[in-house]
């Protein structure tokens, strides 16, 4: 999973993700927008569900983040289906509306985002 952080002329940080992970970039750009407290909440949730059967979800204005002990899923709220309806090999997939990745990979992006934010 490749990513890039950019700062626009107003100083706002934008995240660009590799193909198949665009929704993760959109989540950072639309939901996080520099809100490090939200990232604290996500990191705490990842620690809480690690090694358990539990999952956690955070619905935002445009995107919802789900995570369990192994995987993170970010989907556009406009898709309107629940996590239970996603099946192996599902036929509906839109790279910009749905992204899946491992928890550790996601937390690496979160850490890199924090680091980039501090380089003002």
From Swiss-Prot:
Under the heading Pfam families, the entry gives: UPF0231 (PF06062)
Q: Which domain of life is it from?
A: Bacteria
Residues folding into a coiled coil are none
Record-linked HAMAP family: UPF0231
User: Which family is this protein grouped under?
Assistant: Belongs to the UPF0231 family.
From the Swiss-Prot or TrEMBL record, give the protein name: UPF0231 protein KPN78578_01240
State the species of origin. Klebsiella pneumoniae subsp. pneumoniae (strain ATCC 700721 / MGH 78578)
